[in-house]
């Protein structure tokens, strides 16, 4: 539990959410490289290798130019033309193209590698400008690779290059020079000779000989084709290298110095490019840099997939293409089949299989080649959030009042879109366009009419002119011929002309009137037309009218008008108001009312397209990353089929059409809304109708009443008439029949008259009709005239009618209906018809929309709030862009089987595991389970219970398998899977719930209680809980073992009470407790009691109530429990599984029957004994009471008998008068006794009862039998329970309960430990994979490398600070956890991690590391090499000695200048100079291992010169260990080594003389080296090498770990921009001074908090020093350092409260010489201590003179302090003490007194008092007595020696001398004590004396007459 709490302190080192991980990767910067090096060193070749592996973009001039030319871009065409024309390409253009490439999308995704910047050409840009260009790139370079190569080696290599004149391929010297090839062959041959047999050697030699011959033949063939390029000439190469060093090198060195040293990779240019590439890859792997994610096309040209394939089948097919590994298929993305490129634009297009790619382990389907190209270049913009998301192109349709506008607004707010109201934005524009069309049509018609009228008038004018000409001609002829007859034709023509003229004049006159009328008429028509256009803009007309022909005629007749222009001047002006024009356009104006577009719906679609374009342009920035198209919701769109067809044709296709409907309860909800909206209108109509009906009813009632009254009146009259007739009949019985008929006629007339008068219908019926029956239809047929007549008659009575209406309205009430319904009245029928017609139109339109593959969402509005509708719409819109879950099908199982078989073929170990586990179990173990592992996620979320899922009910979500408890749970998951999975953190596991069961007496209660206390959870005893439920009422426990005792006790008590009553005895209370009254138990309590009594299982209803409190209710639900003794029966276990109350495990405590007997039988026997004792006591009491009762009864009976006898006697005496003799009396007494014996016999039961009592042996046997039977029953029951629990997949834990209690408890804790400690990871599952597969996954970015990189997270959590290195000896073990790969260093750590991954990823991320550089020095045979090798094997560091470095250069680079110089020295028999050795060491340090893991330098440096060379080359070790071993131990080890060494054919360099020389040389030089490193770098550690190698190893590792931890912490904090401690970082004092901050060596924390100037320059230690923002600061203590590290900004400018004073304002301590040099300046305060005076509140007593040893200068004043403490106070707070004034009265001056002038006591007191006291005290303690001297003289001598030995003013030599003499004096004094103890009175032979007795006796005797001081 504690470990779990501890892990929660830290956040996850890696992002837990998979989507967030992907987003983080997409936002990350790609790794960018820059390669520096001399020209020709191999930058381009290395860049080519890196590009192939790292997939970054190589930005070089030549590939870019070739790419531009091949793509035939504008720049490419220009470049090609320049090259064809023989021109050179300007540098400016090349740089421009390179910059374009560096800023391209491709580079933004993959990163770049630059090799040609800076270039040697300075024409376009200088070197500094080129460097600034690199620094100012959007993507800054992360890694700088510097290839180093000596000038000589580089020039030789380049000058040896040759180029093939045909192919252009360049050959190096070792490829074309036969001599070089031969030399390489010989060296290789010599190297391979060692360690091989003769046969193998011969075979290899033959093969190599053949290969060599073939190679030489090839060389001979190409040799005559090789030429040397001019730039490869030696002098040209030298010039280029020289130019590089002069112009570029210095700038590059500055750049590299500024760059993070971790990301600076320096390479040895003499190595081949392949080896350099491997070194770079190792360094990148060490730095944990992520390579660019590559995209893989999932379908080749030869593979074809049908485009119409179902999505599921398509994804299964694509997931198997180019498989990473079995079980690791390409996953489905959120986009599904949607094209991400088009979706980014706002269009939802399905992708095609031919354009499918994989990226980040997921499948993406692109829709076209055009979409695929940009996605392949840079997929990041298309995948970053908010993508994928719906573009929000929605149409919402529905009847009026269905809530579509509300839903539109809410949806627009949700997606930051805009609502396009069709009625407000589209329809007005269409109406306006139609008005414009009508106006244009009328204008065209008017222009055509004007043209026609003008033509007509022109023709008339021409005719008139012709007539006038003819008339003039006639007049001329008439004048010539005075007499003649006119021709008839002329006459007729003239007459006709005149008539025509007159007619035309008449027509013109009438036309004026018509013009005015037409004008007014046309105005009215236009006005009406405009109104009608507004009115009928929604109608569709069958005919369309155009006037194109008129416009064409008008354009064709322009010439005619121009020809007749002079004539037109004579014609009146024709305008639109011309009567003839008005007459002509009247028809057009009438027809314009029905004018519309030829395709009106296309016009609607065009306008809607314009509106949507404007909306999208205005709202394009509605949220970051919003798609270009979309963001609109169309409301109130007409549901016209033709309109939708036009919209689809125009491409206005929504992503979703939402139809709001109300089909439930016949549209009750919608009609309710309509009614509430139009309530007043509908209610008024209802009231009006009800009033009419009521009035009609009132009228009908009134008419019926009148008719009834009339009938009654007629009946009364008839009755009277009949009575009258009877009277008359009586009077005139003799009247004739005629008279009777007349009377009858009169009666009939009387009847007819009232009927006729009463009838007011205005129609009289014939007599025949009166007698016949009236048909039912008649009143209806004549009802109208009746109403009319009544109305006419009632019109004059208005006031009376008004009163009646008011009364009626008071009685009319609206019909009642439910609140959520509407009144079903005729007034609602129009609305119903309207909605019905809308539904019919929608049904027609729905088919059209579906045919266009537009998604339709039918939403029921009944019983749903707008928020619920919005949520449903949002879910529908976003569901296509979410991960989908699907039920596990046969195809999934087939894939799993296929993967398993493939793995079995690859993995041989799997076969071994199969032998132990079955195939099904292996498949189950290897399955990739989901976020709840094998538990049901639905039950976990809803009930917080760990219920194992059923493998038959399985589903897959995001390529992970989930198991479910039931089909219903699976359906819930499939509907909303995202609600049941983990997101930002793992799902919270329920607390521990354990069922603890076992036979009675197994110890489960004790174990459960101890476990619960330890885990801090509840301990629940099931049967005790049941007892507690009854205990309140029963006040006693219930059960067979309790009930039997209580019944016996109750019967005994009852018997005892009865006997006590009989005996009239009061029984004691403890034996006569009252019986409890009977209690009334509830039904539930009765069931519980029955269960306890009869040992039966509880019914499910009771169990549900009890168990739900523990599983589902707080606080137990969130705390956990140990459930003791449950389940008791199989039925209860079955209830657990059926109801879903699953524990984490069921613990079965197993014991034997003998264990039960041993535990329970003693207690049972004691209980039996106690019962027997009570029983005997009770029996004795009963017996006594019965005896007492018997005695009392006998006494009563005896008294009765005696009374009877006496009575009889008295009677006999009276009768016989005789005295009774004594014999008779005795006989009578005997008779009485006999009677009593007969009546009260002795109780035989009591006599036999004692014999029937159970004996102890019998009781033991009985109890043993009962326990055995109970144990067997319990065991059988538990076995069934165990089988039942296993059936429900509940884990079973078996514990042997027969052992001791603490052992059982320990075993139980260990078994439950995984459930407790690994609780946080209970749902996590890890998958180990091979290392090659891990690298492949990282290459394809199928999985991500974790934040730990190649650190072992387990070892990191255990405090390891040295990164493990992968090699053959130390393999790594990759493990996949979620989307990350973790690398573990051993199998043990792998197992730990897999059990609890959450624990190890909840820790701080690993700190940045640097390669460890260790130097180990020491004398020969001190163990340097042993320790170095141990470090190398343990941590993978390189073991390097100076000899090894030299051999490395000579063997691997023999042609280099360094190797040649070394060979020159060695061949002459000289040692290699230190300068060359250090160069070889530097080359060796450039190895990959040295720059990743680190290096251990063994035994170097050993001289000061070597140390200086290391410093000059900046080879500074992190730590130097000196193994200190005495010389004696060295030679001892040498001898042991020689004894054990093997004999070799050559002498070893390990003779004693050589070792002695080396030892002396080492000890001579090591002191100076040690002092230098201790002072400069403080990295020197001395290890006592005299200890064992394990002790030395532990000390070394402890110090390495400490220093490495300091280094890592420093790098981590500096990288985060925080302050960091700089201790243990090898910082020199010079560097410290150069980088001191604003406060120099004063503590900034003290200055800020207390304004104290704490000078830290007194110590050279950097323990309290820190770095912040590139400056160093020193603090005064650890507390101050911690404060500075926590908030450094508060203590440095600009937030620092106090700046450091200027130099003249800082107090300075003065030495005695500096104080003397200030003469004649006097001290302030007359030499009194200012600190003492100020701290003493400036009192007189505080005036203490200062000491000149503690002088200081401040403000150009001198102050003298009393002591060092006061001096420090003044130096820290000068402002407090500097300005003070002395009082007027001062103490007298203290003048010095000569010591010799004092009297002897004073002299001794002031001079040697302290020393003398110490000497006398020592003499008193020792009591010295020198041989042959008195005690006084001995004491004086000792005091004198003591004073000399401890004289503080004496020299060191003098003190040592007298200390030695004092020791000799004390030894002589001790001789007396020794001899006194050992010498006896009797003589002893020498052999019986002590060994040293004679020697000490001689010494004693020799001291006679000898000076004890001088000898």
Swiss-Prot record:
Stored CDD domains: ADK
Keyword Transport in annotation: no
Annotated catalysed reactions: a ribonucleoside 5'-phosphate + ATP = a ribonucleoside 5'-diphosphate + ADP; AMP + ATP = 2 ADP; GTP + AMP = GDP + ADP; CMP + ATP = CDP + ADP
Pfam families: ADK (PF00406)
Chain spans, region NMP 1: 60-89
InterPro entries cross-referenced by the UniProt entry: AAA+_ATPase, Adenylat/UMP-CMP_kin, P-loop_NTPase
Binding site for AMP 2: 1050-1052, 1079-1082
Keywords, ordered alphabetically: ATP-binding, Cell projection, Cilium, Coiled coil, Cytoplasm, Flagellum, Kinase, Nucleotide metabolism, Nucleotide-binding, Nucleus, Transferase
Protein task: Broad-specificity nucleoside phosphate kinase involved in cellular nucleotide homeostasis by catalyzing nucleoside-phosphate interconversions. Similar to other adenylate kinases, preferentially catalyzes the phosphorylation of the nucleoside monophosphate AMP with ATP as phosphate donor to produce ADP. In vitro, can also catalyze the phosphorylation of CMP, dAMP and dCMP and use GTP as an alternate phosphate donor.
Known disease link: Spermatogenic failure 89: An autosomal recessive male infertility disorder due to severely reduced progressive motility of sperm.
UniProt similarity note: Belongs to the adenylate kinase family.
Protein name stated in the entry: Adenylate kinase 9
Native source species: Homo sapiens (Human)
Taxonomic lineage of the native organism: Eukaryota, Metazoa, Chordata, Craniata, Vertebrata
């Amino acid at each position: 539990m504690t470990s779990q709490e501890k892990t929660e302190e830290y956040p996850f080192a890696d992002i837990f959410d998979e989507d967030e991980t992907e987003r983080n990767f997409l936002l990350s910067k790609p790794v960018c490289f820059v390669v520096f090096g001399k020209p020709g060193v191999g930058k381009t070749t290395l860049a080519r290798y890196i590009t192939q592996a790292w997939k970054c973009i190589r930005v070089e001039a030549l590939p870019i130019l070739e790419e531009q030319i091949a793509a035939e871009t504008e720049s490419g065409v220009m470049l090609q033309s320049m090259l064809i024309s023989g021109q050179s390409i300007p540098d400016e253009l090349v740089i421009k193209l390179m910059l374009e490439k560096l800023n391209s999308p491709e580079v933004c995704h993959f990163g770049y590698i630059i090799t040609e910047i800076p270039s040697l050409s300075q024409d376009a840009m200088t070197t500094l400008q080129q460097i600034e260009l690199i620094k100012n790139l959007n993507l800054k370079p992360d890694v700088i690779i510097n290839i180093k190569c000596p000038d000589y080696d580089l020039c030789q290599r380049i000058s040896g290059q040759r180029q093939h004149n045909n192919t252009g391929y360049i050959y190096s010297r070792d490829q074309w020079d036969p001599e070089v090839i031969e030399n390489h062959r010989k060296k290789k041959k010599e190297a391979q000779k060692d360690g091989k047999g003769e046969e193998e050697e011969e075979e290899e030699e033959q093969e190599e000989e053949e290969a060599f011959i073939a190679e030489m033949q090839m060389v001979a063939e190409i040799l005559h084709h090789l030429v040397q390029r001019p730039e490869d000439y030696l002098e040209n190469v030298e010039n280029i290298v020289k130019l590089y060093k002069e112009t570029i090198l210095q700038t590059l060195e500055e750049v590299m110095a500024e760059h993070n040293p971790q990301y600076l990779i320096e390479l040895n240019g003499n190595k081949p490019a392949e080896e350099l590439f491997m070194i770079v890859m190792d360094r990148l792997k060490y730095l944990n840099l992520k390579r660019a994610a590559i995209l893989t096309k999932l379908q080749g040209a030869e593979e074809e997939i049908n485009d119409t394939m179902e999505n599921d089948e398509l994804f299964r097919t694509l997931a198997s293409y180019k498989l990473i590994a079995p079980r690791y298929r390409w996953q489905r993305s959120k986009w599904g089949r949607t094209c991400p490129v088009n979706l980014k634009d706002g269009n939802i297009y399905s992708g095609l299989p031919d354009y499918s790619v994989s990226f980040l382990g997921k499948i993406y389907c692109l829709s076209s080649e055009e979409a695929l190209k940009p996605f392949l270049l840079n997929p990041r913009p298309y995948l970053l959030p908010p993508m994928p998301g719906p573009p929000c192109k929605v149409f919402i349709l529905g009847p009026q009042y269905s809530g579509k506008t509300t839903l539109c607004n809410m949806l627009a707010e949700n997606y930051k879109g805009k609502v396009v109201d069709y009625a407000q934005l589209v329809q007005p524009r269409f109406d306006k366009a139609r008005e414009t069309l009508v106006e244009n049509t009328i204008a065209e018609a008017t222009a055509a009419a004007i043209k026609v009228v003008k033509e007509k008038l022109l023709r008339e004018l021409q005719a008139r002119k012709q007539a006038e000409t003819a008339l003039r001609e006639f007049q001329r002829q008439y004048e010539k011929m005075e007499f003649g007859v006119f021709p008839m034709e002329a006459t007729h023509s003239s007459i006709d002309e005149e008539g025509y003229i007159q007619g035309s004049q008449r027509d013109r006159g009438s036309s004026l009137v018509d013009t005015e009328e037409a004008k007014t008429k046309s105005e009215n028509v236009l006005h009406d037309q405009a109104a009608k256009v507004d009115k009928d803009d929604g109608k569709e007309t069958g005919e369309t009218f155009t006037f194109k022909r008129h416009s064409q005629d008008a354009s064709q007749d322009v010439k005619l008008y121009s020809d007749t222009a002079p004539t037109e001047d004579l014609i009146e002006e024709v305008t639109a108001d011309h009567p003839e024009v008005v007459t002509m356009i009247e028809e057009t104006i009438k027809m314009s009312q029905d004018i519309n577009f030829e395709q009106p719906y296309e016009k609607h679609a065009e306008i809607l397209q314009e509106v949507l374009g404007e909306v999208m342009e205005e709202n394009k920035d509605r949220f970051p990353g919003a798609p270009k198209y979309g963001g609109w919701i169309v409301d109130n769109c007409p549901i016209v089929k033709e309109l939708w067809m036009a919209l689809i044709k125009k491409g206005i296709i929504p992503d979703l059409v939402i139809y709001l409907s109300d089909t439930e309860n016949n549209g009750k909800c919608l009609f309710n809304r309509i009614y509430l909206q139009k309530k007043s209108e509908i209610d008024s109509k209802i009231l009006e109708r009800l009033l009419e009906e009521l009035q009609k009813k009132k009228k009908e009632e009134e008419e019926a009443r009148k008719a009834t009254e009339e009938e009654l009146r007629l009946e009364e009259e008839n009755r009277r008439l009949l009575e009258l007739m009877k009277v008359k009949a009586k009077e005139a019985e003799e009247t004739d029949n005629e008279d009777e008929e007349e009377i009858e006629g009169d009666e009939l007339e009387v009847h007819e008259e009232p009927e006729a008068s009463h009838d007011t219908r205005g129609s009289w019926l014939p007599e025949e009709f009166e007698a016949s029956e009236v048909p039912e239809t008649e009143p209806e047929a004549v009802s109208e005239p009746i109403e009319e007549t009544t109305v006419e008659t009632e019109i004059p009575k208005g006031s009376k009618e008004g009163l009646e209406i008011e009364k009626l309205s008071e009685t009319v009430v609206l019909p009642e209906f439910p609140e959520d319904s509407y009144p079903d009245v005729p007034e609602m029928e129009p609305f119903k018809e309207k909605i019905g017609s809308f539904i019919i139109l929608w049904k027609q339109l729905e088919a059209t929309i579906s045919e266009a593959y537009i998604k339709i969402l039918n939403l029921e509005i009944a019983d749903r709030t707008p928020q619920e509708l919005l949520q449903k719409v949002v879910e529908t819109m976003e569901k296509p862009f979410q991960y989908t879950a699907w039920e596990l099908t046969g195809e999934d199982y087939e894939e799993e089987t296929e993967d398993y078989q493939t793995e079995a073929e690859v993995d041989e170990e799997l076969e071994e595991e199969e032998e132990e586990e079955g195939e099904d179990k292996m498949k189950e173990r290897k399955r990739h389970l989901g976020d709840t592992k094998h538990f049901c996620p639905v039950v976990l979320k809803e009930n917080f219970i760990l219920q194992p899922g059923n493998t038959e009910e399985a589903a897959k979500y995001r390529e992970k398998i989930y198991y479910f408890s039931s089909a219903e749970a699976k359906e819930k998951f499939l509907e909303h899977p995202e609600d049941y999975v983990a997101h930002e953190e793992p799902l919270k596991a329920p607390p521990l719930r354990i069922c603890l069961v076992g036979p009675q007496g197994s110890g489960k209660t004790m174990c459960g209680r101890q476990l619960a206390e330890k885990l801090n959870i509840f301990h629940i005893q099931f049967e005790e809980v049941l007892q507690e439920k009854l205990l309140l009422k029963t006040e006693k426990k219930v059960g067979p073992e309790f009930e039997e005792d209580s019944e016996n006790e109750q019967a005994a008590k009852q018997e005892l009470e009865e006997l006590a009553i009989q005996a009239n005895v009061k029984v004691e209370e403890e034996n006569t407790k009252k019986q409890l009254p009977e209690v009334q138990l509830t039904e539930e309590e009765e069931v519980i009691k029955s269960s306890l009594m009869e040992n039966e299982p509880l019914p499910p209803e009771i169990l549900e109530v009890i168990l739900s409190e523990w599983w589902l209710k707080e606080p137990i639900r969130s705390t956990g429990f140990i459930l003791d003794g449950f389940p008791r029966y199989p039925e209860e276990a079955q209830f657990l599984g059926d109801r879903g109350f699953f524990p984490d495990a069921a613990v079965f405590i197993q014991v034997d029957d003998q264990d039960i007997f041993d535990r329970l039988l003693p207690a049972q026997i004691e209980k039996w004994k106690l019962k027997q004792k009570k029983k005997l006591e009770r029996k004795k009491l009963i017996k006594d009471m019965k005896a007492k009762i018997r005695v009392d009864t006998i006494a009563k009976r005896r008294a009765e008998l005696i009374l009877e006898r006496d009575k009889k006697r008295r009677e006999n005496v009276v009768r016989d008068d005789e005295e009774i003799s004594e014999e008779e009396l005795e006989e009578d007494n005997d008779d009485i006794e006999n009677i009593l014996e007969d009546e009260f016999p002795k109780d035989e039961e009591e006599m036999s009862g004692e014999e029937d009592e159970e004996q102890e042996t019998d009781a033991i046997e009985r109890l043993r039998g009962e326990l055995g039977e109970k144990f067997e029953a319990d065991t059988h029951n538990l076995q069934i329970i165990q089988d039942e629990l296993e059936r429900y997949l509940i884990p079973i834990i078996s514990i042997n309960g027969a052992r001791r209690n603490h052992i059982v408890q320990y075993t139980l804790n260990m078994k439950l430990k995984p459930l407790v400690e690994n609780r946080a990871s209970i749902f996590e599952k890890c998958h180990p994979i091979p290392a090659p597969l891990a690298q492949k996954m990282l290459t394809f970015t199928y999985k991500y490398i974790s934040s730990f990189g190649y650190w072992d997270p387990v070892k990191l959590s255990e405090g390891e600070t040295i990164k493990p290195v992968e090699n053959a000896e130390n393999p790594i073990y990759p493990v996949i956890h979620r989307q990350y790969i973790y690398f573990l260093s051993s199998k043990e750590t792998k197992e730990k991690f897999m059990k609890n991954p959450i624990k190890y990823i909840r820790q701080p991320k690993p700190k940045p590391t640097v390669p460890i550089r260790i130097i180990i020095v020491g004398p020969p045979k001190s163990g340097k090499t042993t320790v170095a090798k141990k470090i190398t094997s343990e941590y993978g560091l390189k073991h390097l000695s100076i000899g090894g470095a030299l051999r490395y250069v000579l063997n691997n680079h023999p042609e280099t200048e360094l190797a040649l110089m070394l060979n020159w020295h060695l061949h002459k028999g000289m040692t290699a100079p230190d300068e060359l050795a250090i160069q070889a060491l530097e080359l060796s340090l450039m190895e990959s291992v040295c720059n990743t893991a680190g290096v251990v330098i063994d035994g170097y440096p050993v001289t000061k010169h070597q140390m200086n060379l290391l410093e000059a080359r900046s080879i500074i070790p992190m730590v130097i260990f000196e193994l200190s071993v005495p010389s004696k131990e060295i030679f001892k080890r040498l001898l042991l080594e020689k004894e054990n060494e093997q004999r070799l054919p050559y002498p070893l360099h390990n003779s004693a003389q050589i070792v002695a020389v080396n030892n002396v040389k080492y000890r001579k030089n090591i002191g100076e080296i040690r002092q230098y490193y201790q002072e400069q770098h403080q990295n020197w550690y001395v290890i006592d090498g005299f200890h064992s190698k394990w002790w030395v190893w532990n000390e070394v590792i402890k110090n390495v770990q400490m220093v490495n931890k300091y280094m890592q912490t420093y790098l981590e904090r500096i990288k985060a921009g925080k302050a960091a401690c700089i201790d243990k970082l090898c910082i020199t004092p010079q560097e410290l001074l150069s980088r001191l901050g604003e406060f120099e060596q004063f503590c900034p924390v003290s200055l800020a908090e207390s304004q104290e100037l704490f000078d830290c320059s007194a110590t050279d230690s950097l323990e309290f020093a820190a770095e912040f923002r590139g400056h160093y600061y020193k603090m005064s203590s650890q507390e101050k350092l911690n404060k500075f590290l926590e908030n450094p900004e508060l203590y440095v400018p600009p937030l620092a409260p106090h700046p450091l004073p200027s130099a003249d304002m800082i107090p300075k301590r003065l030495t005695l010489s500096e104080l003397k040099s200030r003469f004649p300046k006097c001290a302030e305060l007359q030499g009194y201590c200012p600190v003492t005076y100020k701290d003493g509140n400036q009192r007189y007593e505080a005036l203490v003179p200062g000491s000149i040893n503690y002088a200081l200068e401040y403000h150009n004043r001198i102050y003298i302090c009393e002591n060092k403490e006061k001096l420090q106070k003044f130096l820290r707070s000068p402002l407090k003490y500097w300005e003070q004034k002395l009082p007027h009265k001062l103490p007298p001056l203290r003048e010095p007194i000569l010591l010799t002038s004092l009297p002897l006591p004073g002299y001794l007191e002031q001079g040697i008092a302290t020393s003398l006291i110490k000497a006398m005290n020592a003499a008193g303690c020792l009591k010295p007595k020198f041989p042959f001297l008195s005690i006084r003289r001995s004491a004086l001598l000792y005091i004198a020696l003591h004073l000399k030995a401890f004289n503080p003013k004496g020299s060191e030599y003098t003190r040592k001398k007298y200390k030695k003499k004092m020791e000799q004096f004390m030894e002589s004094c001790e001789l007396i004590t020794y001899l006194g103890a050992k010498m006896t009175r009797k003589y002893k032979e020498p052999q019986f004396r002590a060994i040293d007795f004679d020697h000490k006796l001689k010494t004693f005797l020799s001291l006679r007459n000898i000076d004890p001081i001088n000898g």
